[in-house]
Amino acid sequence: MANMGSRKHLKRFKAPKMWPIHKKEEVWTTKTSAGPHALEESIPLVMVLRDILGLAANSREAKIILNNSDVLVDGIPRKNHRFPVGFMDVISIPKINKTFRVLQDYKGRLVLKEIEEKDSTFKLVKILGKTTIKGGKTQLNLEGGRNIIADDDYKTGDVLLLNIPEQKISDSIKFEEGALGLITGGKHISEVGKIDEIKITQSSKSNTVLMETEEGSFLTLARYVFVVGQDKPVISLVGDN
């Protein structure tokens, strides 16, 4: 029984900070299964239905909803109540005619932003790296564990617009000075600003970015910057009406 608990459940006080749960109500909570997002960067699908949307009173009701294929993540029906849902995933529930994009609030917690139908056909994915594979082709290594073969036109840090569920590239946003960046970590999390300068280091230290916002400028790590557009964001963000 102890082993089962360690695999499928997690003590609430050990739950990642981004989980929207009360850690003192009960001892255990559901643990995410292996999937596209790491434990500390995701929440289980059951938590989305029960704790965030309130569509299920308990895990049993959430499992019934999922077993009926009533919930799609990035356009694919998901029945596993422990399936990990993370940043920029698109969650659709056709029976209630609602679609949401997973974002972060100003405390770093995962939240759902309801989106219009026209915005539900794509998701944004950041390029973490590039690999040359057999035949000289370029493989893009993306957030969420995805790898896709594409032209060598993209750079690490660029963000792709992927059609879902096909996962085909429809457009891209370059990680460059002048672009709009959403901050995904550090004390400025969830703030949006313009990239003023990208500072490349020639040592083991991380690259940094100087961001400009209406409130002023700040320096952040390059890995915390998720570009979301040029003149304006291509998606609705936290705080937008």
From Swiss-Prot:
Coiled coil: none
Ribosomal protein in keyword set: yes
S4 RNA-binding domain location: 43-105
Keywords for this protein: Ribonucleoprotein, Ribosomal protein, RNA-binding, rRNA-binding
GO molecular function: rRNA binding; structural constituent of ribosome
Superkingdom as given in the UniProt entry: Archaea
Keyword Oxidoreductase found: no
GO terms under cellular component: cytosolic small ribosomal subunit
InterPro entries recorded: Rib_uL2_dom2, Ribosomal_eS4, Ribosomal_eS4_central_region, Ribosomal_eS4_central_sf, Ribosomal_eS4_KOW, Ribosomal_eS4_N, Ribosomal_eS4_N_CS, S4_RNA-bd_sf
Pfam families (alphabetical): Ribosomal_S4e, RS4NT
GO BP annotations listed: translation
Family: Belongs to the eukaryotic ribosomal protein eS4 family.
Protein name as annotated: Small ribosomal subunit protein eS4
Protein source organism: Methanosphaera stadtmanae (strain ATCC 43021 / DSM 3091 / JCM 11832 / MCB-3)
